[in-house]
């Protein structure tokens, strides 16, 4: 049996810069744990470390599993929740800034395809989120 946990940090003041990390964390969820329906005011990438869950944006629901990633766009209503059996564990990074949308255009994410299925680069996404988490410094407060 595993023990659920949540560790997250966020910047208390958003600055008008080209790209800024807003929050970063990781969480092992209970069965059917849900966020939303809700709207974020920043971009938010989740990488599924283990388990399964669902991401709903508009009328589309995506079933996700370990190795997959999903992107929450700002000002868009979404819901995401852990599967009843084998609930997910994920890492995330939230970011904002004037160049955020331009940078995302260089990725495989798009409003029409807000998920990336398990790829050889999936572990790179996870590793980069963990690097950001490890480098959080003193500007973040525990959320």
Model segments located where?
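A general boundary/transition motif marking the beginning of the first structured unit of a protein
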Residues: 12, 91, 116-117
């Amino acid at each position: 049996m595993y023990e659920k946990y949540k560790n997250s940090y966020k910047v208390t003041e958003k600055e008008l810069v080209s790209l800024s990390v807003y929050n970063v964390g990781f969480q092992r969820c209970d069965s059917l744990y849900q966020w939303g329906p809700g709207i974020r005011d920043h971009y938010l990438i989740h990488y599924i470390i283990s388990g399964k869950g669902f991401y709903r944006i508009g009328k589309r629901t995506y079933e996700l599993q370990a190795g997959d990633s999903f992107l929450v766009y700002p000002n868009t209503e979404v819901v995401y929740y852990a599967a009843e059996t084998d609930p997910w564990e994920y890492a995330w990074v939230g970011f904002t800034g004037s160049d955020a949308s331009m940078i995302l255009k260089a990725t495989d994410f798009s409003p029409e395809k807000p998920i990336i299925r398990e790829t050889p680069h999936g572990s790179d996404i996870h590793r980069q989120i963990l690097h950001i988490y490890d480098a959080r410094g003193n500007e973040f407060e525990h959320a």
